[in-house]
Regions:
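Long, contiguous binding/interaction regions
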Residues: 1-87
Length: 87
């Protein structure tokens, strides 16, 4: 049976310079994640995607902000699809 499966991911980035903040807002738009909170030098991203998509997002931000990053992942949740796969 087809299912819909998602995982929640929060990423906090801190001690960001103005240019870095702008880059993070742009990359968040590209990844399709939400900026849920921010101030002058920190922000929190929220992603509700598949586990592998969240892996890719984490990999990107770790590459650029590892020492200034916190990440929290929730477990995956799933529900059976209501549409039939043979359509």
């Amino acid at each position: 049976l087809p299912i819909h499966k998602k995982e929640i991911l929060f990423i906090k980035l801190r001690a960001l310079k103005r240019e870095e903040m702008e880059d993070v807002f742009r990359s968040a738009a590209v990844f399709g994640v939400s900026v849920t909170d921010y101030d002058r030098s920190s922000l929190i991203l929220e992603s509700v995607k598949t586990e592998s998509e969240n892996d890719d997002i984490l990999k990107y931000y770790k590459k650029h902000f590892l020492s200034r990053m916190e990440a929290v992942r929730g477990g995956a949740v799933a529900v059976e699809s209501v549409s039939r796969s043979d359509r």
